[in-house]
């Protein structure tokens, strides 16, 4: 009996213990233990703290970049820079050292002579240093000196920057031929050359296909000279190459496409109003004969559209 009771108790306890074991085996990431996750979290936190501390580190700026010194009483305060001090030191001769003779009296005499020499030499040295410092630190006079240097340089004559714009001789002019793809070609011609000569010289065999446009005018007359068209040196002439079968001479060729487009636009515009009138008439016919299919809002909308269209038509054709 006792053994059976123990077996029953063990069987009743086994599910609870199995659930506890399952809960203890649960991890945050499958295949990785909780201890590893804790260690990784501690390492990540440590790295974040180290990076935060490094981000607040500021390097000490050198004290040798800008030094300000105050001159003793009686002298003007001057801001000394490193390179200014070097220039001043180069300009002033270094004092030579004199050997000190032995003896107290000689030392006293030398001290008095040195003090007297320094007293007389300091004003001269300051007088030599102050003009050089004032010249170097004169910020307001810097633009004037630069302007003086710029004016002393000889100015290059106009037209020398670009060698292509210069004409080879006084009797020749440079003409820039610009195409639709923004490419340019430099043509050298004489003022008495004609448009036909320019075409045959630079577009041989394509004279009938090339169209030259200058200041919005189409150069159609091949017998006109460049001087008569006010084409001077470095002028720009726009060039257009038409397809071989589309070259039609005369002003009628240029007017035909525009007239066709305008007539097409007039026809479409004139047809819009009759078509809309017919549509409104059909809708009103169905409204009168089949009024059971039209609700109140639909009827009100139809009346509003009709009134708006009538006002628009009277406004267009009543002028």
Swiss-Prot record:
<keyword id="KW-0812">Transmembrane</keyword>
<dbReference type="InterPro" id="IPR040352">
    <property type="entry name" value="TMUB1/2"/>
</dbReference>
<dbReference type="GO" id="GO:0036503">
    <property type="term" value="P:ERAD pathway"/>
</dbReference>
<feature type="transmembrane region" description="Helical">
    <location>
        <begin position="298"/>
        <end position="318"/>
    </location>
</feature>
<protein>
    <recommendedName>
        <fullName>Transmembrane and ubiquitin-like domain-containing protein 2</fullName>
    </recommendedName>
</protein>
<dbReference type="InterPro" id="IPR029071">
    <property type="entry name" value="Ubiquitin-like_domsf"/>
</dbReference>
<keyword id="KW-1133">Transmembrane helix</keyword>
<dbReference type="Pfam" id="PF00240">
    <property type="entry name" value="ubiquitin"/>
</dbReference>
<feature type="transmembrane region" description="Helical">
    <location>
        <begin position="264"/>
        <end position="284"/>
    </location>
</feature>
<feature type="region of interest" description="Disordered">
    <location>
        <begin position="88"/>
        <end position="128"/>
    </location>
</feature>
<dbReference type="InterPro" id="IPR000626">
    <property type="entry name" value="Ubiquitin-like_dom"/>
</dbReference>
<feature type="transmembrane region" description="Helical">
    <location>
        <begin position="36"/>
        <end position="56"/>
    </location>
</feature>
<dbReference type="GO" id="GO:0016020">
    <property type="term" value="C:membrane"/>
</dbReference>
<feature type="compositionally biased region" description="Basic and acidic residues">
    <location>
        <begin position="95"/>
        <end position="111"/>
    </location>
</feature>
<feature type="domain" description="Ubiquitin-like">
    <location>
        <begin position="173"/>
        <end position="246"/>
    </location>
</feature>
<keyword id="KW-0472">Membrane</keyword>
<feature type="region of interest" description="Disordered">
    <location>
        <begin position="145"/>
        <end position="165"/>
    </location>
</feature>
């Amino acid at each position: 009996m006792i053994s059976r009771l123990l077996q029953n108790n063990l069987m009743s306890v086994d599910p609870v213990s199995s659930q506890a074991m399952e809960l203890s085996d649960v991890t945050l990431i499958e295949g990785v233990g909780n201890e590893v996750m804790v260690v990784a979290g501690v390492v990540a936190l440590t790295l974040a703290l180290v990076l935060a501390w490094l981000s607040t580190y500021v390097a000490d700026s050198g004290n040798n970049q800008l030094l300000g010194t105050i001159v003793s009483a009686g002298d003007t305060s001057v801001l000394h820079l490193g390179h200014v001090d070097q220039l001043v030191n180069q300009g002033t001769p270094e004092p030579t050292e004199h050997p000190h003779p032995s003896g107290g009296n000689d030392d006293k005499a030398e001290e008095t002579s040195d003090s007297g020499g320094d007293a007389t030499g300091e004003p001269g040295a300051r007088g030599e240093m102050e003009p050089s410092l004032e010249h170097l630190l004169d910020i307001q006079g810097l633009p004037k000196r630069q302007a003086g240097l710029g004016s002393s340089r000889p100015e290059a004559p106009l037209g020398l920057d670009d060698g292509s714009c210069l004409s080879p001789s006084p009797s020749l002019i440079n003409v820039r031929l610009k195409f639709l793809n923004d490419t340019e070609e430099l043509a050298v011609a004489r003022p008495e050359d004609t448009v036909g000569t320019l075409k045959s010289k630079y577009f041989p065999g394509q004279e009938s296909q090339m169209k030259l446009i200058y200041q919005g005018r189409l150069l159609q007359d091949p017998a006109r000279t460049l001087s008569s068209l006010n084409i001077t040196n470095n002028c720009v002439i726009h060039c257009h190459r038409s397809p071989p079968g589309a070259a039609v001479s005369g002003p009628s060729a240029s007017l035909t496409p525009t007239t066709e487009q305008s007539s097409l636009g007039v026809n479409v515009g004139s047809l819009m109003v009759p078509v809309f009138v017919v549509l409104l008439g059909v809708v009103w016919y169905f409204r009168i004969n089949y009024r059971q299919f039209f609700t109140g809002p639909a009827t009100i909308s139809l009346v509003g559209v009709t009134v708006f269209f009538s006002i628009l038509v009277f406004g267009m054709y009543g002028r």
